From Swiss-Prot:
Pathway: Amino-acid biosynthesis; L-histidine biosynthesis; L-histidine from 5-phospho-alpha-D-ribose 1-diphosphate: step 3/9. Binds 1 Mg(2+) ion per subunit. Binds 1 zinc ion per subunit. Transmembrane segments: none annotated. It is found in: Cytoplasm. Its main location: cytoplasm. This is Phosphoribosyl-AMP cyclohydrolase. It comes from Bacillus cereus (strain ATCC 14579 / DSM 31 / CCUG 7414 / JCM 2152 / NBRC 15305 / NCIMB 9373 / NCTC 2599 / NRRL B-3711). Its cofactor is Mg(2+); Zn(2+). GO terms for molecular function: magnesium ion binding; phosphoribosyl-AMP cyclohydrolase activity; zinc ion binding.
Length: 101
């Protein structure tokens, strides 16, 4: 099985190996998905810049892919990673650090 990219982008939920903490949500197009498989590092598609980006390329906070899980509809993916440094550009471990309730 492989992701269905018929709509162009799929959500990629990134979780930390071991803790299973949700680190971030980003989007992949087919090219980002293929580069992730090839390099075993996370690649995403930036909707604002309309280009590919490699997590940690400039910050050094890289993500090493341990496993990938495809959902039942083949239109979203969970990326299980070994995270180096914080995942969030703010310096927080995870992008999900604002508690609402």
């Amino acid at each position: 099985m492989k992701p269905n990219f018929s709509k162009g982008l799929i959500p990629a939920i990134v979780i930390e190996e071991g803790t299973k903490d949700v680190l971030m949500l980003a989007y992949m197009n087919e090219e980002a998905y293929k580069k992730t498989l090839e390099t075993k590092r996370t690649w995403f598609y930036s909707r604002s810049r309309q280009s590919l980006w490699n997590k940690g390329e400039t910050s050094g906070n890289v993500q090493y892919v341990q496993s990938l899980y495809l959902d039942c509809d083949q239109d979203s993916i969970v990326v299980n990673v070994k995270q180096v440094g914080p995942a969030c550009h703010t310096g927080e471990k995870t992008c999900f650090y604002y508690q609402i309730i």
